[in-house]
């Protein structure tokens, strides 16, 4: 079975990209367990707790990330360099994501057959 990586690289609420990626991820998890989730660049903001999307008239989908355990999604990584660049090293995110340096993150991403970017 092909391994599928979902890469979140955009900030939430500025576009529908993050919400659509999350919907695609959850739907795909019903078909396969060979999934990996990566948060890089501004995508690290997807996992911040306490967001207030209603202030910009956006849907609050961030809490849906907490369903990863229910959907057996446990391969989750976050870019350590992206966290440092944004001053987010000591934040408790809404999911447990393993921080990886860019070289290790690229190596891990190389283990996947299909890469979907949101």
From Swiss-Prot:
Transmembrane regions listed in the UniProt entry: none
GO cellular component: cytoplasm
Xref: SUPFAM superfamilies: DsrEFH-like
Gene3D superfamilies: DsrEFH-like
HAMAP family reported in the protein's UniProt record: Thiourid_synth_C
Function: Part of a sulfur-relay system required for 2-thiolation of 5-methylaminomethyl-2-thiouridine (mnm(5)s(2)U) at tRNA wobble positions.
Protein name: Protein TusC
Organism expressing this protein natively: Salmonella paratyphi A (strain AKU_12601)
């Amino acid at each position: 079975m092909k391994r599928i990586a979902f890469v979140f690289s955009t900030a939430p609420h500025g576009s529908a990209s993050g919400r659509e990626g999350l919907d695609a991820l959850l739907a795909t998890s019903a078909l396969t367990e060979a999934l990996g989730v990566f948060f890089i660049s501004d995508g690290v903001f997807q996992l911040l707790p306490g967001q207030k999307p209603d202030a910009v008239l956006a849907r609050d989908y961030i809490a849906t990330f907490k369903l990863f355990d229910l959907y057996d999604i446990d391969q989750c990584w976050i870019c350590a360099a992206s966290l440092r660049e944004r001053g987010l090293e000591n934040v408790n995110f809404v999911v447990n994501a393993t921080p990886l340096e860019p070289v290790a993150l690229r190596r891990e991403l190389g283990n996947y057959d299909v890469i979907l970017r949101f």
